[in-house]
Amino acid sequence: KVHKSPFKSIFNEIFSSGEYPRSLSFNSPLGESKVNLYSCDDFSTFNLIFCRQDYLYRNKQKIILDIGSNIGLSSIFWLTRSKDTVVHCYEPSTENYEKLKKNFQDFVGRFFAFKKAVSSKNFSTLHNIEKSGVYNSIRNLNKNQN
């Protein structure tokens, strides 16, 4: 049981309701944890990760790379599985990066956050920022590079 009030959570998910930003307390293998959510999109993402269990966890993951971390929900999933897990997060959006750091306050020493994008190429970028931050993207400004 992840949510303390499952029926209220289902209602909020279906009707995209609830007040934001808000702090959500939830049950994890390490006990009670909390996360800051900033939109109903964040709440929906939280439910996909924590309730639908989109990630396979086998108690072997010690180092996690979270590329495009957004506000850190995926990283928090891994950090709440084991006290031995360390997460390296990469998030280029300034707004999301600040939210991510706030969400990691309970995990000092177990995460490393970088305000950077990750690519196999070096290029100047244009950030396409979407209001919730869930659908942000990066575009190469040099049209001669693929």
Predicted regions and their residues:
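Phosphate/nucleotide-binding beta-alpha loop and adjacent structural elements of enzyme active sites
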Residues: 1-146
